[in-house]
């Protein structure tokens, strides 16, 4: 065993954190190693990883990380995080610009944000074990459609700026008959939204035209010149309320698509965009109970009119029925998405912001329509009171209708007013030397309103009762919203707590058992890593606060940039991307810009292996690159002959190749360096997808094997939880020559980034996210993970991740073929179980096996990727031997069940697999007309492995096993019915009656 493993239970000092992050104890690790034929976890690394990869570190198989500190214990790491947090100065930030103070109800913070039942689950691809999240996401969609007055909404996008960009791209697809390639945007758009839109437009060849949409003399000639769409903020960045219906009518007449960017809270009082002629509405739901978090994470939304359902990007939850005819939720219209349509998908988005959408939905359920309206009235009343008081004090407050944002005009005196507010602990929006803006939010109290008025030279005597908003009738909301009973049923803490508990019990998270999804790395999210996320120093910081207020966060960001650069071998890192898919787009856009800067404008071909994740092809398309697919060999490796042929056929046009290492086939390819060399010799760049970096951390570096740029997944490799489908963080690491093309930001307080070998570099590309550093409030999780593990701990985690995958492969290979293996017959951190022979022989499909695993108490592995009819299993280092064996026992038992179907013992149309999963309602039904027992159907895992577990001293009490049973709330969901009868809003209560 390695020294790190031997010290796991030592008596000298506290146990290292890595000994609790890794699931198995020392004796079990020794047993696992001996079972697969190695002497230690370290040996599996040396036997499985090709020497060409291990030797990439100048003959030393230990990655050099000179800035990486040794592992800290939890007390020390927490103390350091407290010190870092103390470097932040949290003021009363009334900056606005898309980020607002909000009050997260404690019942939501405690029962969702801080609850592993919610934050450790995966994207709800398996609907039967995701009904709680899917119900909340349906509520979120109902909330959005109600407030925007449109027909259908998705269940979240990454942030407001990317939602606006997705809206532009949707408009381009939907208005394909329009020949014009021009897209109109309002002059008064948030700066960060404009920059992200411009970046996507540049990548896809769209011409963005800025015009004042409040001035017909400005916008009318632009519309008449032709456009395929328009983006109209409502209210706009100056705070002004205006009616965009005239603009929308004109754009419709030329065949374009109209998009409104809306403040969601304001729509409780304002006419919904759907009633004003918008085809699409986008925006952020951040102010629905989600802290600003120095930029994120937050859930953005998009809603569309009827007829655009198949154009909408991202996840869409629909209502279907299960095998017993009961209503059930599931992801709808998945044929739009990247994992199926690849480069033809509506978007490259994969991870979204499920956890934050759930928080926003819960906030709406908690307050209901009456409560939300009260909050909105309070916000706008206080804003109008402040405006009246400041106007009475002689300040030039813009004479415009507004919801929450006051615009003060001066002649060079804006900074003086800003300084006065800062002295009193308030940070306002200094637009320029002449303009100061104040955005009021729900956290502003009457006392603070008076204090701020005095600081700016006004009199509190002028703050009186509710001010006259004087909004015109055509901007006042008259339609009802949030009328579904769910929005009026849970307004006491007892009822809300129990409702959230019931939904959580419907789901399967890591708090219940292993989630062995291949290519997903569902590892432990330790409590010690999670706790800083909700500290006010991180959660209450505004992303556009002055740089001096963010010293702590900037220090943490710098640490992460340096540590990740050292682990990957690259020169620089950007933490801005909010997901792995966004990281892919960022890296590929940097490559495209790099080629253009050198005059190589013809280099627009991205080579993508046939085995690649669908996101790769979709990201290449979103970055303006043409996808050319490279074949794979029978052993899963890249076909270098086909690669050479594709390079030759596209001579002078190769921009990049996208590869994943280890490969998506779950093996370490020996020829990866040769592949990189071939592309470099053709003038292309090498993008290495970091989705599988958990199998390489501490033992190999992407840059050393030929990579020019990679994205990582902090929500996989570096312990940020998946949140049931987001948040994620997808940082991009790159070599120095690509650094200038990584994303900058128009409002970045620090655009200089550290270089791996010292010095700094500026990232000057278009922003890809609304916030300068993306989702800063979850970065302490990865910082804590790295600080607690240290390099040796990370190496140990990699060793055990690979060890566990090979143990599963070893236990199952006699009954279920392992599709691909690498050198010495080993897999990497995941293995592909080939169920195709079983299906051919028994008729039992991969879907049947996945659903039957639910009865055994497991989330299914990844289905039919990268090969149809297979399961890809990734156990991670966090699972212990008992859980690995429980999974293997279940898989072997399922094989035997399939053989009983093959033998005719059970009919093909009535057996435990075809009927899986078995919800509790079937167990207690009066009739049981199946050729197998209720126990076998509903409790199949109760008696597995008893003798072995007894020998290990484990609890084999069947009562205990029964008590631990996970019950799916529904039977198998009918996906086809759900797509043919598309319903994406909350079903009426009577739908759930018997």
UniProtKB/Swiss-Prot annotation:
Its cofactor is pyridoxal 5'-phosphate. GO terms for molecular function: glycine binding; glycine dehydrogenase (decarboxylating) activity; pyridoxal phosphate binding. Disulfide bonds: none annotated. Keywords: Oxidoreductase, Pyridoxal phosphate. GO terms for biological process: glycine decarboxylation via glycine cleavage system. InterPro entries: GcvP (IPR003437), GDC-P_C (IPR049316), GDC-P_N (IPR049315), GDC_P (IPR020581), PyrdxlP-dep_Trfase (IPR015424), PyrdxlP-dep_Trfase_major (IPR015421), PyrdxlP-dep_Trfase_small (IPR015422). One of its GO terms (cellular component) is glycine cleavage complex. It catalyses: N(6)-[(R)-lipoyl]-L-lysyl-[glycine-cleavage complex H protein] + glycine + H(+) = N(6)-[(R)-S(8)-aminomethyldihydrolipoyl]-L-lysyl-[glycine-cleavage complex H protein] + CO2. Residues 1-20 are annotated as: Disordered. The keyword Metal-binding does not apply. The modification N6-(pyridoxal phosphate)lysine is found at residue 716. CDD domains: GDC-P. Its EC number is 1.4.4.2. NCBIfam families: gcvP, PRK04366.1. The glycine cleavage system catalyzes the degradation of glycine. The P protein binds the alpha-amino group of glycine through its pyridoxal phosphate cofactor; CO(2) is released and the remaining methylamine moiety is then transferred to the lipoamide cofactor of the H protein. The glycine cleavage system is composed of four proteins: P, T, L and H. HAMAP family: GcvP. Belongs to the GcvP family. This is Glycine dehydrogenase (decarboxylating). It comes from Cutibacterium acnes (strain DSM 16379 / KPA171202).
């Amino acid at each position: 065993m390695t020294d790190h493993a031997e010290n796991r239970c030592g008596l000298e000092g506290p146990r290292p954190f890595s000994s609790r992050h890794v699931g198995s104890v020392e004796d079990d690790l020794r047993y696992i190693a001996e079972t697969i034929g190695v002497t230690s976890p370290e040996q599996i690394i040396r036997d499985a990883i090709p020497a060409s990869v291990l030797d990439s570190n100048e003959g030393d198989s230990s990655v050099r990380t000179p800035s990486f500190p040794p592992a800290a214990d939890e007390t020390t790491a927490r103390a350091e995080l407290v010190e870092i947090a103390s470097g932040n100065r949290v003021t009363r930030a009334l900056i606005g610009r898309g980020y607002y103070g909000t009050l997260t109800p404690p019942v939501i913070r405690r029962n969702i944000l801080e609850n592993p039942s919610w934050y450790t689950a995966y994207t709800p691809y398996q609907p039967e074990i995701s009904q709680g999240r899917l119900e909340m996401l349906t509520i979120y969609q109902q909330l959005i459609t109600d407030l925007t007055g449109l027909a259908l909404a998705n269940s979240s996008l990454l942030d407001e700026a990317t939602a606006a960009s997705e809206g532009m791209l949707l408009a381009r697809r939907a208005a394909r008959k329009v020949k014009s390639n021009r897209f109109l945007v309002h002059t008064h758009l948030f700066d960060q939204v404009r920059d992200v839109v411009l970046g996507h437009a540049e990548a896809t060849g769209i011409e963005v035209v800025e015009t004042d949409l409040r001035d017909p003399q400005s916008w009318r000639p632009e519309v008449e010149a032709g456009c395929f769409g328009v983006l109209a903020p409502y209210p706009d960045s100056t705070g002004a309320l205006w009616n965009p219906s005239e603009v929308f009518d004109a754009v419709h007449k030329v065949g374009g698509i109209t998009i409104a960017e809306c403040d969601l809270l304001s729509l409780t009082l304002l006419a919904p965009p759907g009633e004003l002629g918008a085809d699409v509405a986008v925006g952020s739901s951040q102010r629905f109970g989600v802290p600003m978090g120095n930029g994120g994470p937050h859930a953005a939304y998009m809603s569309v009119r009827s007829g655009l359902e198949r154009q909408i990007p991202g996840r869409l939850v629909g209502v279907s029925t299960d095998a017993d005819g009961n209503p059930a939720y599931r992801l709808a219209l998945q044929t739009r998405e990247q994992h199926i349509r690849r480069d033809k998908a509506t978007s490259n988005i994969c991870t979204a912001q499920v956890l934050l959408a759930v928080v926003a939905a819960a906030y709406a359920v908690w307050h209901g329509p009456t409560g939300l309206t009260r909050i909105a009235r309070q916000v706008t009343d206080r804003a109008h009171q402040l405006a009246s008081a400041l106007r009475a004090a002689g300040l030039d407050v813009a004479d415009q209708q507004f919801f929450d944002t006051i615009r003060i005009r001066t002649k060079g005196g804006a900074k003086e007013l800003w300084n006065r507010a800062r002295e009193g602990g308030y940070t306002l929006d200094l637009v320029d030397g002449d303009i100061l803006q104040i955005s009021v939010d729900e956290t502003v109290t009457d006392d603070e309103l008076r204090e701020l008025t005095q600081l700016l030279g006004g009199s509190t005597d002028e703050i009186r009762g509710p001010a006259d908003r004087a909004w015109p009738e055509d901007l006042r909301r008259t339609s009802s919203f949030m009328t579904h009973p769910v929005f009026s049923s849970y307004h006491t803490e007892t009822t809300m707590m129990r409702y959230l508990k019931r939904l959580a019990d419907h789901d399967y998270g890591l708090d219940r058992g292993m989630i062995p999804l291949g290519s997903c790395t569902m590892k432990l999210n330790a409590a010690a890593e999670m706790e800083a996320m909700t500290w006010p120093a991180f959660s209450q910081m505004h992303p556009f606060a002055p740089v001096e207020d963010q010293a702590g966060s900037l220090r943490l960001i710098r640490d992460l940039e340096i540590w990740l650069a050292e682990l990957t071998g690259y020169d620089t890192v950007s933490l801005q991307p909010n997901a792995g898919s966004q990281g892919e787009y960022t890296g590929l856009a940097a490559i495209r810009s790099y080629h253009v800067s050198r005059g190589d404008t013809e280099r627009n071909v991205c080579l993508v292996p046939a085995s690649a994740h669908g996101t790769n092809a979709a990201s290449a398309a979103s970055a303006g690159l043409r996808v050319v697919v490279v074949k794979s060999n029978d052993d899963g490796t890249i076909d270098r002959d086909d690669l050479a042929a594709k390079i030759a056929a596209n001579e002078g046009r190769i921009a990049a190749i996208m590869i994943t290492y280890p490969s998506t086939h779950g093996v370490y390819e020996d020829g990866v360096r040769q592949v990189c060399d071939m592309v470099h010799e053709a003038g292309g760049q090498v993008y290495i997808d970091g989705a599988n970096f958990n199998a390489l951390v501490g033992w190999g570096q992407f840059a050393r094997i030929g990579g020019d740029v990679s994205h990582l997944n902090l929500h996989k490799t570096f312990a940020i939880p998946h949140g049931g489908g987001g948040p994620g963080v997808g940082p991009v690491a790159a070599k120095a020559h690509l650094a200038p093309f990584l994303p900058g930001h128009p409002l970045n307080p620090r655009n200089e980034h550290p270089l791996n070998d010292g010095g700094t570099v500026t990232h000057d590309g278009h922003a890809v996210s609304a916030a300068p550093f993306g989702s800063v409030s979850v970065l302490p999780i990865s910082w804590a993970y790295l600080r607690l593990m240290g390099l040796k701990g990370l190496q140990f985690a990699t060793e055990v991740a690979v060890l566990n995958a090979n143990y599963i492969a070893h236990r199952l290979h006699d009954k279920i073929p392992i599709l691909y293996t690498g050198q010495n017959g080993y897999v990497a951190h995941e293995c592909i179980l080939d169920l195709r022979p079983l299906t051919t022989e028994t008729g039992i499909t991969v879907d049947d096996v996945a659903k039957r695993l639910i009865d055994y108490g497991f989330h299914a592995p990844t289905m039919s990727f990268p090969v149809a009819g297979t399961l890809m299993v990734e156990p991670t280092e966090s699972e212990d031997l008992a859980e690995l064996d429980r999974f293997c026992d279940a898989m072997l038992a399922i094989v035997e069940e399939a053989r009983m179907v093959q033998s005719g013992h059970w009919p093909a149309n009535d057996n435990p697999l075809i009927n899986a999963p078995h919800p509790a309602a079937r167990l207690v039904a009066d009739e049981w007309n199946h050729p197998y027992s209720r126990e076998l159907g509903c409790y199949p895992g109760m008696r597995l492995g008893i003798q072995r577990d007894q020998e290990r001293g484990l609890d084999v009490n069947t009562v205990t096993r029964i008590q631990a049973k996970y019950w799916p709330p529904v039977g198998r969901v009918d996906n086809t019915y759900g797509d043919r009868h598309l319903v994406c809003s909350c079903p009426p209560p009577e739908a759930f009656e018997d």
